[in-house]
Amino acid sequence: SLGRWWCFFTLILVTHPLLDSLTTYGTQLLWPLDAPPAAWPIVFIIDPFYTLPLLMALIIGSVSGKVRSACRTGLVISCAYLMMAAGAKWSVEQRLTPALAEADLQAAPVLIQPTPFNIALWRATVIDEDRYYESLISVFDRDRVPALEPLRRNVELEASALEGPLGQRLTWFTGPFLRFETRYINGQETLVATDIRLGFPGFHPFSFTLATREGNRWVPVAISEEVRSPRGVHLATLARLAARAGGDVSALCASDYVEPQWRAEPFLYRC
């Protein structure tokens, strides 16, 4: 009927952006208004535990002929998973609060998001001017104050990086969650900004050129280029991630894979 077709397409158009808003990057719910993306990250961008119940429901429904009941069951399971994710994030926020108070970072920008492919292990990123802090918190951790591991942002490069329109657009999208560095690209000193939200410390996939050095000043680029990360994730890394998600604090620290030049206090590590 026309009513069912209307519901079908309306729910697709409404629920898809709402689900996107539950990830780290979020989505522009108010588009075409030029408002920053709305993001309440409680699930990773790719989470098999959310997707598989829906996929299995379609397969079972197609085989058994009971499409409606199978899809209803799959949807209930996936929605219950989102509710569990919201509860897990709330628990992590409560555990992180004492650590922020101890470091006098209560007013600092904080991003709490699940690590890849699960809702048991969460990553907290805290911005504090010239440095930022990373922390891993599992819902299975015992009563312990999370460790905040300090890393460099190279904030002295921030003004030059964000001077041009491309830099302004990038910070509109990322907020303060950027770090900066200089690299030689095609023989030219180039200012590069990295989005530290997605991925994992040491494995950030998105970096962009924003300015080049001409004489004694930085000149914003006309066209920004993505700079690919040479590092990949190995199975051993995922195994350590899984062990840390289970509550083994010694299995993985937030800064274990971070290159030495980003460590703000090299001798204070090992969570």
Would you name each region that the model predicts?
Residues 1-67, 103-106, 111-113:
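Functional transmembrane or membrane-interface alpha-helices that line membrane-embedded catalytic
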Residues 12, 98-102, 161-162:
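Short, basic/low-complexity N-terminal boundary segments at the transition from targeting/disordered tails
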Residues 19-21, 88-92, 118-119:
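Active-site environment of divalent metal-dependent phosphoester hydrolases
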Residues 65-92:
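Internal/C-terminal transmembrane anchor helices
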Residues 83, 87, 112-115, 167-168:
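A short glycine-/small-residue-rich loop at the edge of a beta-strand within enzyme catalytic domains
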Residues 89-108:
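Alpha-helical transmembrane signal-anchor/signal-peptide segments
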Residues 108, 121-123, 127-271:
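Extracytosolic and intramembrane catalytic regions of membrane-associated proteins
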Residues 114-116, 125-126:
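Short, conserved, surface-exposed binding loops centered on an aromatic residue
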